[in-house]
Amino acid sequence: MTNDKADFTQGNILKKLVAFMMPILGALILQAAYGAVDLLVVGRFGSTSGLSAVSTGSQVLNLVTFVVIQFAMGITVLIARYLGEKRPERIGAVIGGGAVVFTMMSVALFIAMVGFARPISVLMQAPAEAVDLTASYVRICGAGIFFIVAYNLLSAIFRGLGDSKSPLLFVLVACIVNIIGDLVLVAGLHMDAAGAAIATVTAQALSVVFAVMLLLKKDLPFAITKKDFRLNPQCRKFLKIGLPLALQEFLTQISFLALCAFVNRLGLEASSGYGVACKIVNFAMLVPSSLMQSMASFVSQNIGAGKKKRAKQSMFTGIGVGLAVGCVVFVLVLFKGDVLCSVFSTDAAVIQNGFAYLKGFAPETLVTAILFSMVGYFNGNNKTVWVMTQGLIQTLLVRLPLAYFMSIQPNASLTKIGLAAPVATTVGIFLNIGFFIYLNRAEQSKSILS
């Protein structure tokens, strides 16, 4: 059974949603800081080539990480659904099956990232001066991919159980270890991009050990047995939810990798500036991202308990919270982007290029507040095929073509390339509004017939 704090089917929606969201936001802030520290330390104590390598290599790592997170969303939603339905005895098989599936995924990613690190770097159009360092960064992160996958799986399990505080502790451990590692390996031993990658993998490994220990000590409302660790029927259920999300996220991240490649064609300073801007973008997207993740568990529990109206109300509450914060972030990014960029680099050209991208990207901080809450609602409502569909439309028909078009213009600029993101997101909002109206009408028709 869920305790009162983890029971989202009753009580004030705003208070419950914010209380559940805040630890997720805290974890995402630490994760963003975790990634930013690599760029910050390399930018201060490494080379410009090393900065470009971390920028480009982290785009590859982000692709893998975000796809894994969306894959794991299937586990989060299914666990929350079983809690809402008061059937916790099924959760052990979900966790055991998830461990097997994600281990298989780790092996495949290990082979791809370690064996093809250099071709990946070339495909990303890393500047010639930074290809070797980029390949080294990707290869080292690939060698430790098991820990990165395991961390995200464990976090998904805890969130499905209504516990958003434990993942915050996991990432806190990782962040502290990563900072120490960067200072020792990059600032102290001058290992440049390779040192940043080693620090990242070491930090993730220690956080996984901590997470496993915490899960074993947790008072769970179900049992996990050896027979659960196999490809069982629950695998098909969480894959049905997670696969569409993972595919959609994969193609979305591919579009951002392509965007990175478009920018790399503009030169080393543009590449480094874009990398700095992306770290700021990561921070700007934290509240919408935390709302989306918390919304999935919140909605899934209420759908499982038969409280569809409450599930819809939670979506609108999330949009309101996101817009309130988004207005503040929009002003900071649009008018103080150069100050934000100067935190990560002292190079005037890098700062100028980073700020140029942020000017075009700025409206994204507002429209994403709406889109992500809607996507979180549909994820929790098991409409992940739709989430995939609308995501693919945004990526393949809007964001990628528009960014490419902007990049090949004679007067190409990072500001114009940055506009591709908010334009695509706006299209996504209209698509989701239409689908929401369609579902409501279908639900009303079904109610009348019954």
Per-region residue spans from a language model:
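Short alpha-helical transmembrane segments in multi-pass integral membrane proteins
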Residues: M1-M21, I79-F146, G188-L243, V299-E364, ...
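N-terminal transmembrane alpha-helices
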Residues: F8-L40, R44-F45, Q59-G74, L78, ...
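Interfacial/gating helices of multi-pass transporter permease domains
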Residues: A19, V42-N62, E129-L133, A193-A194, ...
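Transmembrane helical elements of multi-pass membrane transporters/channels
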Residues: A19-D38, I140, A174, A203-S207, ...
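Transmembrane alpha-helix boundary and packing residues in multipass membrane permease domains
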Residues: I24, L28, L40, V77, ...
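Helix-terminus/linker motif at the lipid-water interface of multi-pass membrane proteins
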Residues: I29, A33-S52, S121-A128, V184-M191, ...
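Small-residue-rich hydrophobic transmembrane alpha-helices
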Residues: L51-I111, I148-P167, G273-V331, F335-G337, ...
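Short runs within selected transmembrane alpha-helices of multi-pass transporters and secretion channels
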Residues: A72, C141-R159, P167-C175, A196-V209, ...
